[in-house]
Regions:
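Active-site/catalytic core of tyrosine-dependent DNA strand-transfer enzymes
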Residues: 8-57, 88
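A broad, structural surface signal
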Residues: 11, 15-18, 65, 69, ...
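Short, well-ordered loop/turn and helix-capping segments at boundaries between secondary-structure elements
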Residues: 19-23, 55-56, 73, 77-78, ...
Length: 122
């Protein structure tokens, strides 16, 4: 992806990243490759971990699809969801002129999503 993608964080994600940073302090990446600490994890790492914990039918992409579906069902704006998923605008004219990020709305949306995921733990 050659364009900037800003990802608003939930409180839960912020805490996870803070904890991970404390573990990897001094390393170039928060989620570094276990083999090469100066490189990021590979595209297949999450899927391999899902298989390792016994979720052979689940892929990392399934989490994106689940989030998208539930956020649409909760009534969030299509533009916010698509922007959060880093989907490119198919309308070339709109893509040329509309550079909105909807950061405040997406921050609330991602907090709502994180709260939903947290509720699954209970």
């Amino acid at each position: 992806m050659d364009r900037v993608h800003i990802v608003p964080m939930s409180d839960q994600l912020y805490e996870i990243l803070k904890d991970q940073y404390a573990i990897t302090k001094g390393q170039k990446y928060v989620f570094a490759s276990p083999q090469k600490r100066d490189c990021i994890i590979s595209r297949t790492t999450l899927n391999k971990m899902l298989m390792y914990i016994g979720l052979r039918e689940v892929t990392a992409h399934d989490f994106r699809a689940t989030a998208s579906t539930l956020l649409y069902e909760k009534g969030y704006e299509e533009a916010w969801i698509e922007k959060q998923l880093a989907h490119a605008e198919s309308n070339k004219t709109k893509a040329s002129y509309d550079h909105s990020q909807h950061l405040d709305a997406r921050r609330k949306m991602m907090q709502d999503w994180a709260d939903i995921v947290d509720s699954w733990k209970d």
